[in-house]
Amino acid sequence: MYKAIRKAAATAALTMGAAFLAGPASAAGSPDSGIYAGDWLVRLRAIEIAPDARGSGTLGALGADVNNAIVPEVDFTYMATNNIGVELILGTSRNQVTSNIGALGGVGVLPPTLLLQYHFNNAGRVRPYVGAGINYTLFYNNGLHAGGQSVSIDNHSWGPALQFGIDFQVTKRIFVNADIKKIWMHTDASLGGTSLGTLHIDPLVVGLGVGMKF
């Protein structure tokens, strides 16, 4: 299922990109298309969170890794101008941590992300966009353990985020969306007061969904 979402998002992005490059017949505006200053865009996506995990210190020696997850995500974009938008992304997941000595348990991850976006071809039906911003990650419901002891972790981190996506308008208000984000996040871990090192999660987030313009 992970590969299916990635393949679907990649296919959608390529298809929409080809339509955009094809010219006026597919990408040009019409009275019922486009986004403009003051518009709100709300999207609901299915996303695959694919961590690029690596650990330092003991975590690195143990080969600590973080499993993929598929979850729903919702985001809200406000168009400050015809081309510039501000997006807030909301979603949460439960990720399992593994190591060379076996499963270490799971932890909840809540990573609200705020992005400044630039939307190309704002008056058209096919609208690529790019974004950059900041991510705050809250780690909660920590269920990590090793050797019969609980593993303590820092409960938050800050990091940058980058984004590329495409909206394809199908009616006056409804559009479909493909989106790829890279988010940097990490947490420090300890066991019995002894540092285990830092776990960098740094996921690639691939999503496919639908949206509505207000």
Label every model-predicted segment:
Residues M1-Y36:
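Cleavable N-terminal export/targeting peptides
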Residues P111-L116, G131-Y136, N155-I166, I180-K182:
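Hydrophobic alpha-helical segments of small multi-pass membrane proteins
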Residues A25-F76, N141, G211-K213:
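Short glycine/proline- and aromatic-enriched beta-strand/turn motifs that initiate or cap beta-hairpins
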Residues G23, G38, N82, N122-P128, ...:
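Short coil turns and loop connectors of transmembrane beta-barrels in diderm outer membranes
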Residues N95, T171-F214:
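Predominantly the C-terminal beta-signal and adjacent terminal strand-loop region
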Residues G38, N68-P72, G106-P112, V126, ...:
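Residues that define the transmembrane beta-barrel architecture of outer-membrane proteins
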Residues A28, A46-A50, D75-A146, P203-F214:
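Gram-negative (and chloroplast) outer-membrane scaffold detector with strong preference
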Residues R54-G60, Q96-L104, Y140-S150, D188-S195:
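Outer-membrane beta-barrel translocator domains and adjoining extracellular loop/strand segments
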